[in-house]
């Protein structure tokens, strides 16, 4: 009996029953219980002394603190976001648009994100979703964009060109994100054969090895017209050295040899067609159109009269990537357009020449200076010359778009005659 009562007392103490009974006696004023207290004080005292109540309170506090701590940790982690090339360009979007505008193109933020995160990734050339400033990845994407015919993407040319501009001429905020330069691959040096020691013998003398006679570079006939144009210095002529001539004598050189000699003597005056691409030591170099380029562009694209939009997009991509000179623009127009189409394009372009107020002007001197019909003296090595060419290419594109909007040919409409069995509808 005593053991059962002790177990009951232990359970009562565990769940606070004894304290509740004691407080109840205090509340009803039992004898020896002391002064009576208010119900709120009694309930607080019961909750404080009960272990189960304290456990409930701890659980409630923990359920409140855990979400708060989780939220604070998540905010801290989100505040430390990783910067990617794409997010970097979006943070400096005004500078990216200015860079594209200097190249004569326009880019839009939404399409910039779509191309970087989806379109170029789906090309399967190694382009990451977060973007990159690696020239290898940019070149792989350019191969897909500049593919001839229907496989290309002329509308994406301004965007990949701006990416390349940021990678080749990076601003200060791009330099820390450029990939490290690749170490130059050095080819292993060929192993030179060790000279074998001469055989010594007491019976036979050692004779030195004589080199085999080398064949003459030039034919033995001095009057032969063949000339070695691949060597910098003239090769030795067969025969002995004769006495010098008594008087100065100027030999008559062929046109090819004279041109090569002038190129070696005057490298600075090599070409007047000024360069459009940067070569070694940041010096521009001139890259003219090849005959195969012009042939491929003409054969893989519809004529201007059939699809002016497609041909205009092609010419726009060529102007942006090659940045041709005035002469190259004329060569491009002659290869891709007919004579009538060229005249219409040039006429529409001259209508768009801006004046001092930015609106199209009708002053002949300003039009001839900005969009000349004869070869101008624009020096691409100077900022003024490059600005002239940039504006000329923009006006040429405006002329192509204006010529594409042709009016209705009423003469062809009049040629349509209703047949005898056709209804007026």
Swiss-Prot record:
Here the disulfide bonds are: none
Q: Name one GO cellular component term.
A: host cell plasma membrane
Q: Where do the record's region annotations for Disordered lie?
A: 174-285
List the biased-composition ranges (Pro residues): 177-196, 213-223, 233-248
InterPro entries given in the database record: G_retro_matrix, G_retro_matrix_sf, Gag_p12, Gag_P30, Retrov_capsid_N, Retroviral_Gag-Pol_poly, Retrovr_matrix
Q: Name one GO biological process term.
A: virion assembly
What protein name does the entry list?
Answer: Glyco-Gag protein
State the superkingdom: Viruses
Residue stretches spanning the membrane: 55-75
Q: Where in the cell is it found?
A: Host cell membrane
**How is this chain modified after translation?**
Glycosylated by host. Cleaved by host near the middle of the molecule, releasing the c-terminal half containing capsid and nucleoprotein domains op GAG.
Which segments does the topology annotation call Cytoplasmic? 1-54
* Role: Plays a role in viral particle release. Presumably acts by facilitating the fission of the virion bud at the cell surface.
Instruction: Please report the organism this UniProt entry assigns to the protein.
Output: Feline sarcoma virus (strain Gardner-Arnstein)
Alphabetical UniProt keywords? Glycoprotein, Host cell membrane, Host membrane, Membrane, Transmembrane, Transmembrane helix
Residues on the membrane's Extracellular side span 76-425
Per the record, membrane topology reads: Single-pass membrane protein
Report whether Transmembrane helix shows up as a keyword of the record. Answer: yes
